[in-house]
Amino acid sequence: MDNVNKIYIDIDYDRLRKEMYDLNVDQFLIENEGQMSVQTIPGTPVDKQPLSGTLSLQVDWDSHDASDPNSKPKKRDVVLEEKDFTEVCDFLKGTYTEEVINMLTQEYKVVRGRYMMMNWKSCLTHHIDQTPRIHLPLVTNKDCFMIIDGKLVHLEQDITWLADTTLMHTALNSGRHLRFHIVFCLPPIEDGRTENQLEFDLE
């Protein structure tokens, strides 16, 4: 598997974008550190669902003092698992976005889906994920990139992408406008295969 590959699946990106704006998701992201869950753990109260799977599930970055070179974020008291975020959040019930989530769940068993916004002139930490990610770029610009295993890639808008984020990577928006993606995690492999041995409908 290359660092990024196209997934050929029929998604109406215009409808996804329209629903994002109609549901005021963009405003929620601006007010809540750029993330909003689209999948949650079954039984999560409705009012807790939108933030239930956001930010790091392992560490609390609020405990990190960036001015101290020896500071490290502490591990969360309760560490959640990506694979447990399987239920579509209530605010998306009956929407086209729910249809897309269900389609991706059927095809790829996706978990812990989130809307993710990147502010202009910003980037993420350099890190690795437990499993690859599926990206649905809703709004992007030519100055948005991922760097995966040292290679610079641009995820074009309105194309569904599989990114091998089990490699060291980051993402950056060096443009002048906000970037909006929907991002899904693939589930952990249970049969001994590595993530790179998965088969997809790729180019």
What are these regions (language model features)?
Residues 125-129, 146-150, 194-195:
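A short secondary-structure junction signal
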Residues 1-100:
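Non-heme Fe(II)/2-oxoglutarate
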Residues 112-129:
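Conserved short histidine dyad/triad with adjacent acidic residue
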Residues 155-157, 162-165:
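Extracellular carbohydrate recognition and processing domains
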